[in-house]
Amino acid sequence: LDALREQDAEVYAQSQFERAQIIANDANTPFNKKIAKISKLNFKGAGRFCMELFIKNKEPMEGFDRFPPIEQAIDLIYDFPAAVNMQDAEYNALFYALGKSDQKPGSASKIFEINALMAMKDAGFGDARLSFSYTCAKCKSSVGLFSHRCPVCYELGSMEIRAQISEKTGEIGQTF
């Protein structure tokens, strides 16, 4: 990054992301202090980064208060066993659509797939679920796993989560 900085390239977000990784991997820092330090860093995806740490460390999500916009975390929260962040209308709509909350949202979600799941749930059709793919907004590459940095063009914070409606299956997807 120093070489790029000398050429007047914008490296602030990358340096913040690297700091977050260093803080997250510091074994001497208590978990709560890690989250507090990372939350103060300013890079796209900091909220998701903290949420990933909560999940990785098996911390209860009740202690998490910096939820990212649902567009940045829908794939993480989709399989949560219980509803979280219900004061946010988008989170509320998703958990209502999944049947994990009885609190019907007051307005439609801005994500079409969530609205479709809610309509199917209300109509008694419960055989739908969401699957996710990840696309870089800069180079348009599509990958199977989320990454904070595009694995093709290396752009930080450019991965978009795309939800698709698919059919629920009773199988676990393992080969014989």
Protein language model annotation of sequence segments:
Residues 11-22, 44-57, 82, 92-96:
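Amphipathic alpha-helical repeat scaffolds of TPR domains
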Residues 73-176:
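Cys/His-clustered metal-coordination modules, chiefly Zn-binding fingers
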Residues 1-19, 28-41, 63-81, 87-91, ...:
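Alpha-helical repeat scaffolds
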Residues 58-62:
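Short helix-capping/linker segments at secondary-structure and domain boundaries
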